[in-house]
Amino acid sequence: MTDERGNFYYNTPPPLRYPSNPATAIFTSAQTYNAPGYVPPATVPTTVATRDNRMDYTSRSNSTNSVAIAPYNKSKEPTLDAGESIWYNKCVDFVQKIIRYYRCNDMSELSPLMILFINTIRDMCIDTNPISVNVVKRFESEETMIRHLIRLQKELGQSNAAESLSSDSNIFQPSFVLNSLPAYAQKFYNGGADMLGKDALAEAAKQLSLAVQYMVAEAVTCNIPIPLPFNQQLANNYMTLLLKHATLPPNIQSAVESRRFPHINMINDLINAVIDDLFAGGGDYYHYVLNEKNRARVMSLKENVAFLAPLSASANIFNYMAELATRAGKQPSMFQNATFLTSAANAVNSPAAHLTKSACQESLTELAFQNETLRRFIFQQINYNKDANAIIAAAAPNATRPNTKGRTA
């Protein structure tokens, strides 16, 4: 590898002696050399045109166009090799990172700028040289496709009695372990290798087992059924609708009003907390939420309000603006008074008013639920191991015991 790399750099053109490398250079006078033993050619034209024809070093040194090029100095070759090899190794490493990024979505060694650079190169390649795709229609009608799917279901259906007792959506069967689990292990636990390793499959099965066991323990503790991802999907849909300024459907509106879904409650509480921090003197924690533009706006607004009035009077911008409007002659509107009265009455008469907890109490409650979940998780593992050992112990003597089913004593 070292000899090949040395030959590679030896055949490269010599380094540039000028700020740029013009494709065409014209010299208006002949070159003279004072080196001893130099014999000028018989005829040297007064105007010599040289073109960068990408020849190797040997052919360039023997051509007549090499009059304007300094002779190659081999003493500089180690320095060039060292500098060029650094960039060569960096390019190879970067290409390997790109391959790992596209193969297994590994971005651990890539910076955001590098990812943006990779995506830019990909977009440029797609735009300049798009790939032509031929679409072949396999089915003439939907009925043909349905018949094909029915035939595949019969051919690739249940293979044994254990799977025949289970439903189609049940993953606790050998077909899921043999088909779907290797793909999951190849994607997340194989380290970017081409061939699936046995350790990767075992690690994927272990992690999935722990995840399912913990979800079961958490569901029993929190008294919530196991489809826990439904809550996250509902929160994602709610957040998407809010970002798009779309109309909320009735089911999401009822979910928001019921306050039974913690993720939706956190979204609403976050928005209200940001408003309190911005305009009601709640603090400066909004710096972690706002972008640079809005952060500068809010800071400028607070500085201007503090310049107009003392900090004690302008901390709550709502009250300060209401006071200024009242001094200017504005009468409070009937709807504003009704809103304050209604909100106060709801806060007092609400059946959940006595359930208001402080932040410390909420944290202690969450910690208690997590401890209970871990306790149930540990007991599940103990019971599972005990039952598995009992089944193995019971199956050992039954292997040699004759079948007496149907006989009477």
From Swiss-Prot:
Mod. after translation: O-glycosylated; by N-acetylglucosamine at one or more locations.
| Entry keyword annotation includes Nucleotidyltransferase | no
Choose one Gene Ontology CC annotation of this protein and give it.
virion component
Role description = Major tegument protein that participates in the egress of nucleocapsids from the host nucleus. May be involved in host nucleus-cytoplasm transportation of nucleocapsids to form budded virion (BVs).
Q: Which residues are glycosylated?
A: T128
Subcellular location(s) of the protein: Virion; Host nucleus
Designated name of the protein: Structural glycoprotein gp41
**UniProt KW keywords:** Glycoprotein, Host nucleus, Late protein, Virion
Family according to the record: Belongs to the baculoviridae gp41 family.
Q: Does the keyword Glycoprotein apply?
A: yes
Q: Which GO terms describe its molecular function?
A: structural molecule activity
Q: Where is this region: Leucine zipper 2 (LZ2)?
A: 367-380
What segment(s) does the record annotate as region Leucine zipper 1 (LZ1)? Answer: 201-214
